[in-house]
Amino acid sequence: MYIIALDIGSTNIKALVLSTEIKNKEENIKLIGKVRKKTTDFTNFFYEIKKDFNIESESIECIVVTGTGASFLEDSIDNIKIFKVDEFTAIGYGGIVLSKLNEAIITSIGTGTTIVHSNLNINERIGGTGLGGGTFVGLSNIILQNRLKNNDIMTFLELIEMAKNGNRLNVDLNIGDISKNSIGNMSKDITAANFAAVNKEFTECDLIAGVSNMVLENISLIVKAVNKNDLPVVYIGTMVTDDFVKERLKEIAEYTGSKICFIENADYAIAIGAWEYYLLRHREVI
């Protein structure tokens, strides 16, 4: 039998395909594949998975779904039950299970950002912001629109490469630019004003580095503000799988005094959280 878990976001669908079998009266669950596609069409995506993995509908135990797009789905497809998991629960479960922490602030940077306090028993959204990967890609493309032809859109990976080759200090004003000393408890490395260094020379790469910093620093500061008990912060989402992004988040954490951690499969953490919830909670009562 198979279980398919999907995180249906506003721009992408991510899926996990798991096989289940009973051996010596014990169930063995194995991850056999991960799939990601830029689409919001669940039905076509589901049939593509069936075809690619050679799975018959009769052999699928359940389809576990979460994410903003899950609310648009019916309760079944091809007579297969669709089990819906609240997105905040999936975020909490994914972050806690993968980090192996007992309690943490799970920060999901997707198109926007959601902040969830979780200890598995509690999965509560405590904050969020419209800033996220969508902001980085969208605003960067707006800034670069004069160089783009035929309505081309630069991808996240292309823009990250530009940011790596840029220097945000050529477009941003830091506390250290306007004060000899730190101000209060604010480090000299904290941005005083995004894109305010208009008297400096800068490149397009500097501009994109500035956009990435604006997004990441403000997300980090919002997380710090809502993290009242100074719990560890687990970052999840596709954006935080990039080394450049992780390094910048680490730098910001140093001057905010935050404890942060990164996990493997951070880009699939919400889908993982959904099927973990299904296996650990739902199956206990059926």
Predicted features along the sequence, with ranges:
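Short glycine-rich, Thr/Ser-proximal phosphate-binding strand/loop in the N-terminal lobe
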Residues: 2-47
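A short acidic Gly-Thr/Ser loop motif
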Residues: 6-12, 68, 107-112, 130-133, ...
